[in-house]
Amino acid sequence: MRARISVSDKTGIVEFATALKNLGWELIATGGTLKVLRGAGLEVLDIQDITGFPEICEGRVKTLHPKVHGGLLGRRDKEDHMAQLADNGIQTIEMVCVNLYPFEATIAKKDVTMEDAVENIDIGGPSMLRSAAKNFRDVTVVCDPADYAKVIEEITANGNTLPETRLQLSAKAYTHTALYDSCIAYYMRRQAGLDEKLFLAFDAVQTLRYGENPHQAATFYRSPKEVSYSVAYSRQLGGKELSYNNIQDANAALQIVREFSEPFCCALKHMNPCGAGVGKDLLEAWTRAYEADKVSIYGGIVAMNRPLTAEVARLMKPIFLEIVMAPAFEPEALEVLASKKNLRLLEVKMDNVKEPQKQYVGVNGGLLVQDYDVECKDITADMCVTERKPTEKELEEMDFGWKIVKHVKSNAIVVVKDGATAGVGAGQMNRVGSAEIALEEAKAAGITEGLVLASDGFLPFDDTVELASKYGVTAIVQPGGSIRDEDAIKKANEKGITMLFTGMRHFKH
């Protein structure tokens, strides 16, 4: 039994090769892999000993040879195949262990040149993977170090890998080469100025009970690249399996949390925040978020940007919640919530690096792609367009409200006071309708003065300003940009309201 080994990622390769050698396998390698294995004291054949042909073209041609591919592709159950191999002095190869040049990592470098990229396009590796994968009935193909242990275990127990394992590894190898080639194609098309073709690769991580509704089938997929503030890469510490709607809501909550560096907590329902608050510590942030809407939080999701403490966990415990998300959970907090068997607890990586990412939205027969809306301007006094300038307190409140309204379904209006939401108006077909909802919520809570209003889009008329003035709003932050901006400014001046234009819109559909 012979194994051809050539890996760029050398994780666990010495241990894997040693195990094969101890099981009586003959090892064949080239280049860096050959050096590493021989350096570990293993007896390994150089591929040149097999082909009788040297590496040429600076290593570009090493394994593209009939004595390699014939040994992989020849079917053991066909007499004519075996006779042809024998006539040409070709021995069979029963395993290929290959992973490829790091093309994706190379083109991710800011200073990468076309020459660097091209030299990291693997030719021999994909060819061997495809040959071995095609002949999976006779050949084991390994492209992932995570599979080393299983392969050794099966060979130890059975003398070879199991047929079903070889089929699975074959499928994995073809997936690996397909993704590799799609990455190269995407890069080369961009360099050539051709129309882009989009190649997406996501790994299925969970078959969901159902989708948005019980009659819809659904699966949860994860990007191969780990990112922060991600449900897909969270660690579940307790509770039931996540549902489709849970995942949608949790993702929306995490995008709000990432806006804040100070202690912050929010509650969310149906992808809209129902309560949010900042504070000097998590306890104050939680209290403000909860007090903002004690009713809507029922059956909702809570997310925070500080480790969950036992103190806050005790306050949460009596409330029916679907999910609690935090960067960490104090051991005592986990003990407090341990009796809530259905409550999903997600530990989420939260760093404040706003990695550029693409957002994909399916439409019937197509796909929309855009940059994630990770930008959010800091609110400053020089954005003021009215006669009255904002106080420091109003600036703080506007900054808070602006970060929240960005994540509310359009048309979106949020009113805030004292570092917490006082009312949220979401998803209405006209802006003044959303304003009425938010302002009435604040009024119902007894908050009727010193309010700050934030709008995700410009105010097309002065009616929202007029309405806001009747509910105790003293400051408004909006993008500006309407042909009737002057009407809104004039009305604000009449009412003594300070108003800021950010110059940036945050629609959310």
Enumerate the predicted regions with their spans.
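Glycine-rich nucleotide/cofactor/substrate-binding loop typically near the N-terminus or early
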Residues: G32-F103
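N-terminal glycine-/serine-/threonine-rich phosphate-binding loop
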Residues: M1-I50
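Active-site/ligand-binding-proximal alpha/beta "capping" segment
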Residues: R76-P126, R130-A133, M383, E387-E392
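ATP-dependent carboxylate/acyl-activation modules
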Residues: M1-I5, M95, Y180-I184, M188-H509
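Short gly/pro/ser/thr-enriched loop/turn and capping motifs at secondary-structure boundaries
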Residues: T33-V36, T51-C57, F103-A105, S127-R130, ...
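Mobile "lid/hinge" segments at catalytic clefts and subdomain interfaces of large enzymes
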Residues: M128, N135-Y148
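Non-catalytic interaction/clamp surfaces of large macromolecular machines
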Residues: P145-A146, K150-L198
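Hydrophobic beta-strand scaffold residues
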Residues: L27, V44, V139-V141, L345, ...
